[in-house]
Each structure stands twice: as structure tokens, then as C-alpha cells.
């Protein structure tokens, strides 16, 4: 056994056939154990100059809406304007607009009815569309819709694919001054006094003739005339004794239009007597105020009042 090598197999295993040597086949395995077959990592793709795959959008990013096949390239405003432009009277009801769109484009005919809500919202929220009420004698349901005349050039060169800008109806400012109109009637017009003379009765002319007395009524004059009137019976009062002078001083229309001066005064007005002094005082009768139609007569002793000697001018203390 001196010539055998230590690496030779023992004699007990010499009867088994020798195992064929396995040659290595294929490239070495990838260093990434979890890599999917047929897909290379991004680092290897970047090293070879290839574009990396697009990562999936995160939860905070918005996905782009997929393009629906067969959908017309017109906005809802363009669809409504197209329907109104093809109408005979340039106006249509909401149901007629739906019918035009479904007859012209098969996409809206087969798709759900959600697009009708968009048509309705665009009609009410855009100033380029104007609602026209239905006439009382025109039977039917719903109002008409038409295009604002100022929005006729809203699309470029009549093409419904491009719209210039959002149409905004011009409104008058609230502080704009209104044009002057005709004067308002009396209940709504501001109060302004009518121009006229300050005096209702014109002053007497400075012509020849008797001038009227300065005061037509004076207590002192009536008291002084009392002794004379006592023996004359029932003369007319001084205010009515000179009709010619009063007529010359005042026009007849003013005298006829004025009410009686003492129509509300009672027949007799008696002032209470003052406190008597230590000695007897002469009593002077007071002429009572009577109506214009009643005559002035003598007064009874009970209707007199006492004048104190300190007052020389009569009833100034009561005026």
C-alpha cells in the first residue's frame, strides 16, 4: 500500500460507477436573491443607458383621467352653443338640447346620463346663455335658452374646438347716476313750498280815502265808550260800524273767505272782580264780548268789575 496516494478512494467503494463531472452552464446567478425572472433592477438598466420604468403614483398624487374612446372633442359649452346655432329661432329648451346632442353624437346616446347634469350646470353658471321665459299662449314645459348676442364671437373663426375666453356679462355700476326724467307726482316728489306772496291780504293802497284804524279791537276803547253806549240803545260795534272803510281797505274776496272772528266766543265774557280796597272804589262796567250778530247792550251791575286807582290805563294787567 506504499505506492497508493491518500486521495485514492478505498477499495470498498470501487464497485460503484463514477459520477460524471458537472460542467458549469449559464451565467452566474444574480446577486439579488429576490429579483423577479426576466426583470432587471433599475441600477443595471441605468448603467446600460436605458430608461427606468415609471413608478406607480403614490396615494397623494392624482391619476389622470383616461381618455374615453369615441368622445367628441367638444366642451359642454361648445355642445350647447352648437345646438343653439342650429335651432331655427336660435333658442331651444333643455329637452331639445339633449335631443340634439344624442342625435348628433352616438357617444352621449350610449353613455350614462351623467352628462346631462353637466349640460344643465353649464347653462345656469355661464353668462353667455340667457334664459327666455315661455310666452303665456305657448303651451309646453320648461323655459327657452338662447345665446347672448355679445357672445357670438366667443369661438375662434366659428370653430367650436377653441374658445377665446370666458364670457362675462357687463353690468352697470351701482353708483351710476340715473338720467334725469320727468318730475314725479306729488306723493313721491320732495316737499317744496310753492312760491307765492307772503301776505294773503294785500296791503292797502296809498290812495285818497279814509285809512283803517290801527287796532279794530281795544279794551280801553270799549271801556271809554261804555257811558256813551248806555244811552244810545243798541248801536253796532266799532268793528262793524264802518263797512265802507273796511271794504276799501280789504278786497271783498278776502272778507268773504275769512270766517267770523268771534264765532267761537261765548255770548258773555266777564272777568272776576279784584280784591276791594279799604275804601269804596268807583265801579266801571266792562263791555262784554258778544258775537258779531248780537248787539251790545247795557251791562247789569253783577257783570261789572272794579278798577284799582293805581292802574290808569284799564286792563293792561290782564293782557
Swiss-Prot record:
GO terms for biological process: anatomical structure morphogenesis; cell development; cell differentiation; ciliary body morphogenesis; cornea development in camera-type eye; epithelial cell proliferation; eye development; iris morphogenesis. Residues 44-53 have a biased composition (Low complexity). The keyword RNA-binding does not apply. One of its GO terms (molecular function) is DNA-binding transcription factor activity. Residues 1-69 are annotated as: Disordered. The keyword Amino-acid biosynthesis does not apply. Its main location: nucleus. Changing residue 120 to G: In ASGD2; complete loss of DNA binding; significant reduction of sequence-specific DNA binding transcription factor activity. It is found in: Nucleus. It comes from the Eukaryota. Residues 71-165 bind DNA. Keywords: Aortic aneurysm, Cataract, Disease variant, DNA-binding, Nucleus, Peters anomaly, Transcription, Transcription regulation. GO terms for cellular component: chromatin; nucleus; transcription regulator complex. Transcription factor that controls lens epithelial cell growth through regulation of proliferation, apoptosis and cell cycle. During lens development, controls the ratio of the lens fiber cells to the cells of the anterior lens epithelium by regulating the rate of proliferation and differentiation. Controls lens vesicle closure and subsequent separation of the lens vesicle from ectoderm. Controls the expression of DNAJB1 in a pathway that is crucial for the development of the anterior segment of the eye. It is linked to Anterior segment dysgenesis 2: A form of anterior segment dysgenesis, a group of defects affecting anterior structures of the eye including cornea, iris, lens, trabecular meshwork, and Schlemm canal. Anterior segment dysgeneses result from abnormal migration or differentiation of the neural crest derived mesenchymal cells that give rise to components of the anterior chamber during eye development. This is Forkhead box protein E3. It comes from Homo sapiens (Human). The lineage of its organism: Eukaryota, Metazoa, Chordata, Craniata, Vertebrata.
